[in-house]
Amino acid sequence: GGYQIRLFRSKSLLGPYVDQNGNPAISYGEIPDNQERGTGIRLTSSVQWDGGPAELADVEVSQGHNSAIRRSKDGRMFLVYHTRFAERFSEGDDEDYESHVRELLPTSDGWLVAAPYEYRGSVAVAPTGIADITGDYNVVLHDQHTFFNGKQEDDGTYVGINRPTRYTFH
């Protein structure tokens, strides 16, 4: 249940591949150490959104088996991956998953980030004024060190699940 999608890049196809801090993508230990060391830009993580009709079955976990694709007609990039769900996860049956697509967007320094929503064919439009961005937002920061392992706290919440923080812009 601990799949993670992390980003590294290189100036050469042959490498070396590094993260934003210059850490190498290659791990030399018995177990990959991206999680412990926090290497690589984490594009997705286990998350449970607040509000709406979401139930525990909607807690997204274990995003992985991904591909990045570039659409030739306009150069837009997309992340295609699978995700599993906390309440549908069991050690004996790990085949219940859904395929998802998110657009990849560049930051000002050229790194890619995944849009926070599934791609449904729409095109994002940049805001033109402060009125375009006022309101309440739920923001999830993808903790570099968390992962879903199926364990629950005494209150029923899952260990390793990122929760949103609410921000209001006036």
What are these regions (language model features)?
Residues G1-H170:
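Carbohydrate-active catalytic/glycan-binding domains of CAZyme proteins
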